[in-house]
Amino acid sequence: MELLTGTDLWPVAIFTVIFILLVDLTHQRQRWTSRYPPGPVPWPVLGNLLQVDLGNMPYSLYKLQNRYGDVFSLQMAWKPMVVINGLKAMKEMLLTCGEDTADRPPVPIFEYLGVKPGSQGVVLAPYGPEWREQRRFSVSTLRNFGLGKKSLEDWVTKEANHLCDAFTAQAGQPINPNPMLNKSTCNVIASLIFARRFEYEDPFLIRMLKVLEQSLTEVSGLIPEVLNAFPILLRIPRLADKALQGQKSFIAILDNLLTENRTTWDPVQAPRNLTDAFLAEIEKAKGNPESSFNDENLLMVVRDLFGAGMLTTSTTLSWALMLMILHPDVQRRVQQEIDEVIGQVRHPEMADQAHMPYTNAVIHEVQRFGDIVPVNLPRITSHDIEVQDFLIPKGTILLPNMSSMLKDESVWEKPLRFHPEHFLDAQGHFVKPEAFMPFSAGRRSCLGEALARMELFLFFTCLLQRFSFSVPDGQPQPSNSGVYGILVAPSPYQLCAVVRDQGH
């Protein structure tokens, strides 16, 4: 009997490894399959990719939730995924199992764009030491530069006045408010990151916003899902460059802004902005290979703050103005409260919010109804967890369906209608139901929540203090349905802004 040579052993070794892996997989499946969440039967190779409408993900998930319950499974290509719906299941996932559900799955298209160990930013970074370091830095630095203080409030108020001036220049004319809203919220973020603001007609600002919108469009829909499910496609010459051209252009714009900031940075002086503070940390971390403070990660952190902190606020404000022209009775009541609490002379302040329950309720209802981030960024389990008595194994992608709480019929009296009374009790006091969670919760909650709340209140009250908004003469009322992308934006619309008579 001949002995097998080294060459002959290779097929045997490969077969043995595959056999062991299959036995292990079978054992694992036997352990948890009976308690794994139900879901639609996946197709070979593609899984459920073509069974979910990525152009209207919330409605697809709503139908699946009605069929399979608050916790159900999907198979996106070969990636197992569990969708979490409803307040009870969401709290279990985000809070009870928070330590085991705070991680992010790898996203191949962002790895292609430079997100890698040591330069993963904050939003997409895996849950670990680098993420904690950058989260602490971002929160503390935003606080140092005025978050929650009068200094930042004054800056936002000044920007709100610039926004009002832009509306005044076009008063009485049909206008699309979105470009002006984008510019104002961009300037707030730019003030924190670069200590600068741009004039609304600055060609650089206009180009940057156009590229940012293009970049966000590129990472929503079917194409990025296919690229993430089959990352080998990213190796096809020019395919990824063409599909992600806006992303690369936006990163290049930010890189140029950082270079400008770096040339004027004086390490001896107190930091002027977040970029200066990060550069100081880079200097401190020299020689420490474990540190996440480096030039590449600075670019990723800045990209995260711009992407997450700018269009989310401007899109919510766009919803607010559209809903005001659709509900003039609500608009008049907000203006009445503004006149009673603030008047027409002084600017709104955050301290006024506690005395304006109806305005506060309207802003929160805009967030609930607009539902601009219906599906939160995916998580991945770092250990086996249990949610609603279902066993979800380690390595499963979790998709938090935030819309399932904001439109829950058991929580909201009129979930599909704009109804500010959702946030008022019988005595007219402001109340916030537990299911209102637009900024998520737990370890991965939005780090810019306080800034977003400040911007929404100050911009909204400044605008309604100065103007009355209406549907332009001769135009039909806009639809109150959303347009789905990476954010849910209101359907395109125009409005007329009329300067209010201060003697009313």
Swiss-Prot record:
Induction details: P450 can be induced to high levels in liver and other tissues by various foreign compounds, including drugs, pesticides, and carcinogens.
Phosphoserine found at: S249
Swiss-Prot/TrEMBL keywords: Endoplasmic reticulum, Heme, Iron, Membrane, Metal-binding, Microsome, Monooxygenase, Oxidoreductase, Phosphoprotein
Signal peptide interval: none
Main EC class the enzyme belongs to: oxidoreductase
InterPro entries per record: Cyt_P450, Cyt_P450_CS, Cyt_P450_E_grp-I, Cyt_P450_E_grp-I_CYP2D-like, Cyt_P450_sf, Cytochrome_P450_fam2
Iron recorded as keyword: yes
Cofactor(s) named in the record: heme
Catalytic reaction annotation: an organic molecule + reduced [NADPH--hemoprotein reductase] + O2 = an alcohol + oxidized [NADPH--hemoprotein reductase] + H2O + H(+)
One cellular-component annotation, GO: endoplasmic reticulum membrane
Keyword Plastid (UniProt): no
Positions that bind heme: C446
Subcellular location: Endoplasmic reticulum membrane; Microsome membrane
Highest taxon above the source species: Eukaryota
Pfam family, one: p450
Membrane topology type: Peripheral membrane protein
GO molecular function, one term: heme binding
Chief location category: endoplasmic reticulum
Function, as annotated: Cytochromes P450 are a group of heme-thiolate monooxygenases. In liver microsomes, this enzyme is involved in an NADPH-dependent electron transport pathway. It oxidizes a variety of structurally unrelated compounds, including steroids, fatty acids, and xenobiotics.
Family membership: Belongs to the cytochrome P450 family.
Name of protein: Cytochrome P450 2D9
Organism for this UniProt entry: Mus musculus
